[in-house]
Amino acid sequence: MYIQSLALTSYRNYEHTELQFDNKVNVMIGENAQGKTNLMEAIYVLSMAKSHRTSNDKELIRWDQDYAKIEGRVIKKNGPLPMQLVISKKGKKGKVNHIEQQKLSHYVGALNTIMFAPEDLSLVKGSPQIRRRFLDMEIGQVSAVYLHDLSLYQKILSQRNHYLKQLQTRKQTDQAMLEVLTEQLIDAAAKVVKRRLTFTKQLEKWAQPLHFGISRELETLTLQYHTAIEVSEASDLSKIKNSYEESFQKLRDREIDRGVTLWGPHRDDLLFFVNGRDVQTYGSQGQQRTTALSLKLAEIDLIHEEIGEYPILLLDDVLSELDDYRQSHLLHTIQGRVQTFVTTTSVEGIDHATLKEAEIFRVASGKVID
């Protein structure tokens, strides 16, 4: 798939902009704070219905306007697919093929994108929350069912935490309701964890040979989904539920004392090992960057395996963060397969072969010249 055109209305520092893209490589050149990253973000928001930079949608709306609109014409193997996302202070509404989607979870997945920005290098060394978000965003692109299960889990978790807080402060004394909420939470949690376990194994399958190649055949990358219960990728839903039920029995009194849920996928993590050693703790900066790059490149093949089409790759000021060898490996891996968008302050450092086939856009003060 690829984006043929993009139109922005009142988005960030863009008043109104319409662009036509090359189906291979598009390079956005400009000084910092001119709007390059805003363009990349707009493509990502069109795809995911949320920003990778902020959780406050109001920041996406031009300061003097009431709403922002992103429109794109996506070309897929079955033909063109118009998409539209309107962001207002009341919320977001998405259309796919001119049909308004009742839920954003139905909207997400029509356009698949992979964002690789400097902050993604913290995927390995950052907090578990970053890695959980990575799992949720990437699985959500290929599974609307997962987004539904995750949303349900988060809703029940909030209700359960509220009830635990009431038990803690003696505003409630009936633990029967806690049992009901726990049963519901276990059911939702098991589905979320099962899908994450499967995804982790799929991601490892694609990331392992990539990492081996980038490391000049010196390093073997393995992934582990870390959860407090005894489960594996081979565990079925009933085994996962049984493990959670045992955890609840052990932790119930502590949870009431603390007024919060102490188990579940909202506390899990994704771990990375190179030659058996934890990369986050013991890996060099080079190993951490190779791991992050391998994961991002692996997503391309994983999504292709799941949906039969390659996603769009967004490289936002990340090439300058990679040494020549890793940059060359990245560009060689994607060449000719994936529509790619690159932002940079200068074309220096981007290899000649990539520039030769690229469409060049110059960005300044919210204006784009091609």
Curated annotation (Swiss-Prot):
Q: Which SUPFAM superfamilies match?
A: P-loop containing nucleoside triphosphate hydrolases
Q: Which UniProt keywords apply?
A: ATP-binding, Cytoplasm, DNA damage, DNA repair, DNA replication, DNA-binding, Nucleotide-binding, SOS response
Compartments (UniProt record)? Cytoplasm
Q: Does the keyword Cell wall biogenesis/degradation apply?
A: no
Which residues are ATP-binding? 30-37
Q: Which GO terms describe its biological process?
A: DNA replication; DNA synthesis involved in DNA repair; double-strand break repair; SOS response
State one Pfam family annotation: SMC_N
| Transmembrane regions listed in the UniProt entry | none
Q: Has the keyword Lipoprotein been applied to this entry?
A: no
Q: Name one GO molecular function term.
A: ATP binding
Highest taxon in the source lineage: Bacteria
* Any single Gene Ontology cellular-component annotation: cytoplasm
List the InterPro entries.
DNA-binding_RecF, DNA-binding_RecF_CS, P-loop_NTPase, RecF/RecN/SMC_N, RecF_2
> Which HAMAP family would you find in this protein's record?
RecF
The UniProt similarity line reads: Belongs to the RecF family.
Q: What does this protein do?
A: The RecF protein is involved in DNA metabolism; it is required for DNA replication and normal SOS inducibility. RecF binds preferentially to single-stranded, linear DNA. It also seems to bind ATP.
Return the protein name: DNA replication and repair protein RecF
